[in-house]
Amino acid sequence: MTQLLKPSDYITMPWKNGQGSTAQIHLVPESAQFPQDEFLWRISSAQVSGENQFSQFPGYDRWLSVWQGAGLLLNEQKLEAFAPRLFAGETPIHCQPLSSDVIDLGAIFRRGQVTAQMTAEHLSSQQSRSFTLAPGSHYFFCAQGHLAIETLSANSGSTLHIDVPSEDRLDAATKAKTQYEIKNKLVLRNPGIQETRFFHIYLRKISVSEISS
């Protein structure tokens, strides 16, 4: 499944501790109610306009990066733009923005049930790049410029979301028909004249066999 998520699709809601607001990009499972229900992962973006304390999420881990503005001070340590950082959700964090226009991007995911990675990427004008997508959920968040895949195009602030099924969920006929290995190769393009900067967030549920081993 491939879908384009625009800022108009995001759900704006207060932080868990009430000290700010965030735009929820995607919550899994979608039937969960944040923050009262347990969830597997949540992708969101928030404008940080003043000092605050981060909401705490015991049992979860978090990826965080800045995609607009000068960065953040997290417990007196600088988080620069496009430099994702991983930390435990229960860690007390005092946050201070280094400019008035800071906007972050975050992924919160259930420890022991989900693995996650966040990387900052870029494409020069008219450049294309091939990605091999592992089974799981992939989010390509466009922070600057334009990002295109097949017939879909994301502008700044929009997200391309791709779910890749695991091979064991496909029968033999489907694997042969769709050429599973080839299908998982994705080409991202920058159709614009300016550099594109984006984030790739990859999340995968940990299998029962991995948990028990």
Language-model-detected regions and their locations in the chain:
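Jelly-roll (double-stranded beta-helix
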Residues: 1-213
